[in-house]
C-alpha cells in the first residue's frame, strides 16, 4: 500500500523504455514499463548517490541513458496510481481512488479506456506481469482491458497473507466471500487459471516467477516479429515483502536494502533481454 511520498516511485520507476534497435519498425519501438512498490526516490542510487549504503546500477542505467526527474506527483494509493497510469484519467473520473481489496466490486469498468487497448490497435503484443491491484473480479483482469496476457497478484501483500493469520475467520463462507485470490494467469481469449495462493513462502520468489514470464513474453513477441508493450510490476519493496535466503544479508543493512538490490537485479534481467533481442 503506497503513501503519497512512496508513490514518487510512479514518477521514477514508471519508466518508458523505447528499445529502438529491437524495434520491428521505426514507428513501433518495443515498450517496457517497470514499476516497483513502496519505493521512494531516495531508495535509488541515481538519486541518493550511495548515501543509503547500496547501489541500484540497473535502475541507474535507465536514468543515465534516459532522463532523471526531480519533480513528481503520486496518487495516494496503489490502486489510484495504477489506474491513473493505465487509463490516463484522474482516479476521480474512474472511481478508483481507494485500495482494492478481496471481495470488492471496485475495479476497471468496460468503459474505462486503457493504454493497452490503444497499443493493440497499433499492432502491439500486450502483456502485464506482476501486481495489478485494479480489481478483484474476472471482469477487472488486465486481459479484459487490452492485455493479451496477464500473470500476477491482485492486491497488496498483507491482503494476500491474511488467511495465514491466527485470528483470520474460520468460517468457509467468509473465506469464499472475502478471501484473496491466488496468483492469476489469464489470456485475452478468456482462459483464467488460479496458480495457487500468494502465501508468505511464495512471496519470497513471486517476483522471480513474474520476471520469468515477462522474459518469455518478450522472446515470443520477438519470434512473432511483433512489437511489444510490457508492463512489469514487482512486489518489491512492499513493506511486508519476504525475501528468499539468497537475497537476505547481501547489503548488511537489513531487509529493505536487500530487497532493493534484488529488485534492481530483476530490472537488470529485463534490460539485458532487451539488449539481447536487439
Locate each region found by the language model.
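Bacterial N-terminal signal peptides
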Residues: 8-19
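Formylglycine-dependent sulfatase
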Residues: 8, 22-278
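N-terminal secretory signal peptides that target proteins for export/translocation
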Residues: 1-7
Amino acid at each position: 500500500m503506497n503513501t503519497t511520498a512512496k508513490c514518487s516511485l510512479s514518477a521514477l520507476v514508471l519508466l518508458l523504455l523505447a528499445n529502438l534497435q529491437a524495434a520491428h519498425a521505426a514507428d513501433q519501438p518495443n515498450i517496457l514499463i517497470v514499476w516497483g512498490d513502496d519505493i521512494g526516490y531516495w531508495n535509488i542510487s541515481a538519486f541518493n548517490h550511495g548515501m543509503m549504503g547500496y547501489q541500484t546500477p540497473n535502475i541507474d542505467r535507465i536514468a543515465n541513458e534516459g532522463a532523471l526527474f526531480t519533480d513528481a506527483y503520486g496518487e495516494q494509493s496503489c490502486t489510484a496510481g495504477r489506474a491513473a497510469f493505465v487509463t490516463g484519467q484522474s482516479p476521480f473520473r474512474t472511481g478508483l481512488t481507494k485500495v482494492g481489496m478481496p471481495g470488492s466490486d471496485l475495479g476497471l469498468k468496460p468503459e474505462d479506456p486503457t493504454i493497452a487497448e490503444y497499443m493493440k490497435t497499433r499492432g502491439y503484443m500486450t502483456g502485464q506481469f506482476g501486481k495489478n491491484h485494479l480489481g478483484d473480479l474476472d471482469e477487472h483482469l488486465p486481459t479484459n482491458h487490452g492485455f493479451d496476457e496477464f500473470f500476477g497478484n491482485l492486491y497488496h501483500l498483507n491482503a494476500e497473507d491474511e488467511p495465514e493469520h491466527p485470528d483470520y475467520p474460520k468460517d468457509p463462507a467468509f473465506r469464499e466471500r472475502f478471501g484473496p485470490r491466488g496468483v492469476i494467469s489469464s489470456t485475452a481469449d478468456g482462459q483464467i487459471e488460479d496458480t495457487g495462493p500468494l502465501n508468505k513462502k511464495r512471496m519470497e520468489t513471486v517476483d522471480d516467477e513474474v520476471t520469468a514470464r515477462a522474459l518469455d513474453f518478450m522472446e515470443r513477441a520477438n519470434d512473432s516479429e511483433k512489437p511489444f508493450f510490457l508492463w512489469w510490476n514487482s512486489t518489491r519493496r512492499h513493506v511486508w515483502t519476504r525475501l528468499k535466503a539468497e537475497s537476505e544479508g547481501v547489503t548488511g543493512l537489513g531487509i529493505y536494502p536487500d530487497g532493493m538490490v534484488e529488485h534492481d537485479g530483476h530490472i537488470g534481467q529485463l534490460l539485458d533481454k532487451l539488449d539481447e533481442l536487439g
